[in-house]
């Protein structure tokens, strides 16, 4: 071995000893790759560190364990190409243990046999051939690395500029700290002169000149670039300008930081645009909570939208309405609902209503299908959808008969039924000599309201006699119709209904139903299954009930109060 390494190198080597212990442990776990690099760095620190490293590795190589020998040989083989030249020179002078490892042998392992001994001998032969090879490139000698001093004010390299106020990192420039400080002051003076000097390129002189002796404060270049004049902005930049207003519950008291800037005086011009952009950004998160809002608030939000803010909604409506088929497929409907959840649902609904006017029948049908999907989704309240769509759907329903008219009427009835609104169900009398039509409860399927000025295609089979709440003498139970009697008595009359009816029964039937009505039971309630009874209801009450019924029908109908207070207004 060479001379004994100094004490400082030995103490420094003790800090790296845990790395070496982990890399040469006596187990079958391979040495991690990053430890090879850490061990190679030890050989480059100093000559004493290389001597200590080689001494430790040779001591571990002299161990009787095959796992330790194999790990040490692999580390030495890595250091032949990545270690320092001084380490390679010392290793060549102390290669006796490497020669002994080429003949390493022992009792075979019960499980692995002689495989470990063979690996150690092969690694020792590779290390010897690499170590004494003539073609081995000599690694460049690296000077010992000087660790940078730690502490306040320490510099990573000598003769560097002082770090602090006015410090600029320039690796190419060299000079004293005084020269660096003077150059910093000179550059700052140039910036101030360029900002104050009038010129065509000065951004401060692009504004209007002061009139008379009016005071105009100087504006630094950073402030002018930060707050440009809104009049010179592009439309896209104007749309992104936020309005300055108080927002309760926000950080900083809810006031924007632009209140003290020169551009805050123009904030009132962009308040509508910012309100529209806020409504668009909140449509995805507030869509599911819209049922708790009033329709009036939603209408005010819809009025504050600008046309330029609805470009994504317009593209979605064009994609939905322009398709090869008349109806929307399930995939198209699901994609439409998903996109609406991310956009402004109110704007999409208004654009769909605009597509119902002046477009082809196919586009109208696809737009109606999209509107119908709003009714089945939880994007907007049903009351708000009905408020926006009622006028357009009524105009379409009043048009010429066709699929568009039927679809619009169906959607309107569905929305009215979902909102619980009672729409009128009065029908004109079929005969001029008959009594007034009896008012029955609203039935969505059997009593549709025909559009004004159009022909009635579907008519209810019969009207239901409902006695309103009025001070009219109640008929006796013997004269009540089957619809108003007890269910047990009605069942008894149906069993005994084989008797022929009288002339008065026929007259009463004519006063209640139209001539073309073929219902066998005029007193049955309006139902989808009317006319499908197995037993004909031909037994009618006594003639004395006709006079009482006429008295009842002459009184104005009194609607039953609803359980919802807002429907009784």
From Swiss-Prot:
Residues 506-515 have a biased composition (Basic and acidic residues). Coiled coil: none annotated. InterPro entries: ENTH, ENTH/VHS_tepsin, ENTH_VHS, TEPSIN. The keyword Cell membrane does not apply. GO terms for cellular component: coated vesicle membrane; cytoplasm; cytosol; organelle membrane; trans-Golgi network membrane. The modification Phosphoserine is found at residue 400. Associates with the adapter-like complex 4 (AP-4) and may therefore play a role in vesicular trafficking of proteins at the trans-Golgi network. This is AP-4 complex accessory subunit Tepsin. It comes from Rattus norvegicus.
């Amino acid at each position: 071995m060479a001379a004994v390494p100094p004490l400082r190198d030995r103490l420094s080597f003790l800090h790296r000893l845990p790395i070496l212990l982990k890399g040469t442990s006596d187990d079958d776990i391979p040495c991690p790759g990053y430890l090879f690099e850490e061990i190679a760095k030890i050989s480059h620190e100093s000559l004493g560190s290389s001597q200590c490293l080689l001494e430790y590795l040779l001591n571990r190589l002299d161990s009787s364990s095959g796992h330790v020998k194999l790990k040490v040989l692999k580390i030495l083989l890595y250091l032949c190409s990545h270690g320092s030249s001084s380490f390679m020179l010392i290793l060549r002078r102390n290669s006796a243990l490497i020669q002994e490892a080429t003949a390493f042998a022992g009792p075979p392992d019960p499980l692995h046999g002689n495989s470990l001994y063979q690996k150690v001998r092969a690694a020792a032969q590779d290390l010897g051939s690499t170590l004494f090879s003539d073609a081995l490139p000599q690694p460049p000698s690296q000077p010992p690395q000087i660790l940078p001093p730690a502490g306040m004010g320490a510099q990573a390299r000598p003769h560097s500029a002082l770090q602090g106020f006015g410090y600029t990192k320039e690796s190419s420039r060299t000079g004293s700290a005084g020269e660096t400080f003077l150059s910093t002051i000179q550059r700052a003076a140039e910036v101030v002169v360029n900002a104050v000097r009038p010129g065509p390129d000065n951004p401060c002189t692009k504004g209007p000149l002061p009139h008379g002796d009016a005071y105009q404060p100087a504006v630094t270049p950073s402030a002018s670039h930060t707050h440009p004049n809104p009049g010179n902005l592009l439309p896209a930049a104007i749309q992104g300008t936020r309005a300055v207003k108080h927002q309760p519950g926000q950080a900083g008291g809810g006031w924007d930081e632009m209140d003290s800037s020169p551009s805050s005086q123009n904030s009132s011009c962009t308040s509508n645009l910012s309100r529209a952009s806020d409504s668009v950004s909140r449509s995805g998160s507030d869509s599911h909570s819209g049922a708790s809002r009033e329709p009036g608030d939603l209408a005010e939000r819809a009025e504050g939208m600008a046309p330029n803010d609805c470009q994504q909604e317009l593209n979605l409506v064009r994609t939905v309405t322009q398709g090869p088929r008349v109806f929307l497929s399930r995939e198209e409907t699901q994609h439409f609902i998903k996109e609406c959840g991310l956009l402004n649902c109110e704007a999409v609904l208004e654009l769909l209503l605009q597509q119902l006017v002046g477009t082809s029948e196919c586009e109208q049908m696809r737009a109606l299908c999209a509107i119908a999907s709003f009714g089945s989704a939880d994007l907007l309240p049903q009351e708000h959808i009905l408020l926006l769509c009622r006028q357009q759907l009524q105009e379409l329903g009043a048009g010429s008969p066709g699929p568009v008219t039927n679809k619009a009427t169906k959607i309107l009835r569905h929305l009215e039924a979902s909102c619980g609104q009672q729409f009128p169900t009065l029908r004109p009398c079929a005969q001029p000599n008959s009594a007034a039509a009896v008012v029955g409860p609203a039935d969505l399927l059997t009593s549709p309201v025909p559009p004004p000025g159009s022909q009635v295609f579907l008519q209810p089979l019969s009207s239901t006699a409902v006695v309103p709440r009025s001070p009219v003498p109640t008929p006796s139970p013997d004269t009540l119709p089957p619809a108003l009697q007890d269910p047990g008595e009605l069942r008894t009359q149906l069993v005994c209904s084989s008797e022929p009816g009288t002339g008065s029964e026929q007259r009463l039937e004519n006063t209640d139903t139209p001539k073309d009505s073929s219902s066998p039971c005029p007193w049955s309630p309006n139902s989808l299954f009317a006319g499908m009874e197995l037993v004909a209801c031909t037994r009618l009450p006594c003639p004395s009930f006709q006079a009482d019924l006429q008295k009842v029908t002459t009184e104005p109908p009194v609607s039953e109060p609803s359980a919802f207070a807002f429907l009784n207004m």
